[in-house]
Amino acid sequence: MPELIRKKKKMSSFEMIAFGFAGVILLGAIILMLPISSSAGVVTPFDKTLFTATSAVCVTGLVVVDTGSYWSAFGQAVILLLIQTGGLGVITVVASFSMVSGRKISLMQRSTMQDAISAPKVGGIVRLTKFILQGTFLIELIGAILMFPVYCRDYGWKGIWMSVFHSVSAFCNAGFDILGTAGQTFPSLTGYIANPLINLVIMLLIVIGGIGFLTWDDFCTNKWNLKRYRLQSKIILVTTAVLILLPAIFFFLSDFAGFSMGKRILASFFQSVTLRTAGFNTADLGAMNDSSKAIMTLMMLIGGSPGSTAGGMKTTTIAVLILNAFATFGREPETEVFGRRFDNTVVKNAATIAILYFFLFFTGGIAISQIEHVALSDCLFETASAVGTAGLTLGITTELGLVSHLILVVLMYLGRVGGLTLIYAAISVKIQSGAKRPLDKITVG
């Protein structure tokens, strides 16, 4: 036992994050297997519950059974708890229990919390965590209240539960819906494509949840004084706006030609916003043209922002790479933006993350295409959705076999936990010696 305790003390914060997510997924999968979790009162096979639990904890939204018709009220509640835990982060949830119970947060716990929410420093981490928890529940409550009139009109008292479920699912960028019935499965929000209230509330929840907790802190502290925002917050806000606006304009010009002007604008913006790893859709994605699907695939890979409820490669990663490219084109010695410069380590980390995500995306897509004999473009859309934790699909998820589902499970997990987190968890820090290898030159490009 003493040896076990010593080993636990040596566990790094990155290992705690990686194992924490895995543990919650496994626990959720076991609970969902129970007969009480399914509407038919039967034991659900482990492969289906593992996929569902992974998708919920990793806030993805890909499913192999319809959430609304297959799972009971208890099962849906379990899924919602998994979504909330995954959205906030396992470490944040555990820390919240410690704070509620009055236990002192140790320095090791504070360091782990810092890594979990991508905070710049350990100081003030407990205050920031309290702020995140309070802000999360307040925003989710407001979102649910705003949707009450629509869902209660359509579903009666059941509309209250639907409002709460979809508010949490949207804020956590999870994309799970409970609108399906035995006669119509996997509808997502297609029935509300022309409803301005549902569209706007869901889009706002997705964006607020996906821009990151530190960006919230900047907004609440500095209000509209953007000059005082952190550099990271400025980059996140600009990049998010660009990644929403450009695809929306493209979708408006290339798709939804038969819609009225208002409906077309709503559909274009919603399909763009949901690419920030949300997983809801109001339109038939399979009916969109191939160019739009290609853009959606790329956008899903990018995902949301660091320290947020979203997964994926992250908006800051792509922003750093693009800014570095412009600096290289301009023959600038360093990458600068908003009067600040990046450390070269940031550029190196961004390139590493991008390569890792593209590798997982391509190898996963090719593997599934070979196993299932499905068009590679559809499989790449699916793997981008999984590793970017976006949750959108062209309708092939339920048709895939066990091995392909396991590939998607791994991709969802890697996409939510984060590439560098797993690398740092698997590889210990190397002690640098004083001597360095001789410097040499190599030509690229």
Protein language model regions, located:
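Membrane-proximal intracellular helices of multi-pass ion channels
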Residues: 1-445
